[in-house]
Amino acid sequence: MLRSLCSIAVRLGGARQPRLLSSAASGDGNDGKGAKDAIDEDLLNAIEGVANNIHPQNGSEKKSLKNTLINRLVANEKASFDAAAASASSEMLDDQALIGLLADVAGDAKVEKKLPPKSAQLRQEKRGLVLLRKEIFYQAVQSGFTTEEARVKSETIVNEAQIKLQEQRKALLNDVREKVEQEEVEETERSEKDQKLFTMALEFMEKIYKDDLISSAVRKPVKVDNDAIKLFNQKPLGIWKKGEKYEDFSLGFWKQWDERAARISNGSFGPTNSFEEQIEWTTKGKQWEYPIDNEFKMGDESNVSFIDHVFLERHLPSLGIPKSGPIAHFMHLVCVGLSKNPYMTAAKKREHLKWFADYFNTEKQKLVHKLHEQEQIAAQNAL
């Protein structure tokens, strides 16, 4: 009987959607999780019923049985949460981009390297920001936020951390410290979950950005030579009389590269509204472009005349088709059928005519003519 009642209690608890230990906190700030944090009211009522049925008179035995069942259910819930957290951690560790970024950060901490070019540094910073937003999004979902709230948190928190880091760098350059009281007020106003995510984003941000502005030994200042020739202050030589004919020329590769980087950075979280979603569908060819055109993406067929689709008999003499007889009558029917076909291109229709012309060669024409004469003679004799 105990086994059957325990199975009923477990089924009642499994029928409801389980709450993870990480998202079931009561909000009172205590680190320890009670029984109600992992077990709902229905399951507690089922356990109470099991204890009353087995030990209706003995209060100590009833309490001991309840504690045993609750401890086992909490242990089962904790095991499922640990398994989910382990799979999520393994998925994060399998991310090669994040591993490469952390490896670069660890290498920079151990070995002093030369400062990379400014363009490469900007690309690395953009790449690190995208990865950081993904990590904050994942951590926010694990903390109990919804998907939409996690997306907003990842954007706002990373932006706040970026602004905060820029202010700290400016303060170090100007030897000015920010007010400690203002920081304490901001930290107290921010909730516990937001503060945890903000601290993580700030730590990652400090590793992503290079401290080239702080270290004066990294880049030496360039002294301007005041005695150098100033090219823009010289008189024109007058070699080119008409300068309006000349235009600035630049490689389109760099413009395409910047547009591609912008698309990757902006599209990391997908479209934010239905308008951007429809724009994405239109660029991928999944939706009609406005204004609606029935000849959308016809290609070379848009330049083909209607005459080339309908009047096909004019091609028969050049293909060697006889002007009279059964073959001519058959090819006339072929041309009529092809002229009424709206799904074939004009070139494809001409290929069909050429195939029939190759089929009705000289030998086939003689054979058809002979069979036609024999049929006419047989018809006359039948009369």
From Swiss-Prot:
User: Record keywords: Transferase included?
Assistant: no
Q: Where is it mostly found? A: mitochondrion
Named from the GO MF annotations, one term is: structural constituent of ribosome
Span of the transit peptide along the chain = 1-21
- Enumerate the subcellular locations listed in this protein's record, separating them with semicolons: Mitochondrion
Keyword terms: Coiled coil, Mitochondrion, Ribonucleoprotein, Ribosomal protein, Transit peptide
Offer a single GO CC term for the protein: mitochondrial small ribosomal subunit
A Pfam family per the record: MRP-S31
Q: Note the subunit structure.
A: Component of the mitochondrial ribosome small subunit (28S) which comprises a 12S rRNA and about 30 distinct proteins.
Any idea what this protein is called? Small ribosomal subunit protein mS31
Q: What is the lineage of its organism?
A: Eukaryota, Metazoa, Ecdysozoa, Nematoda, Chromadorea
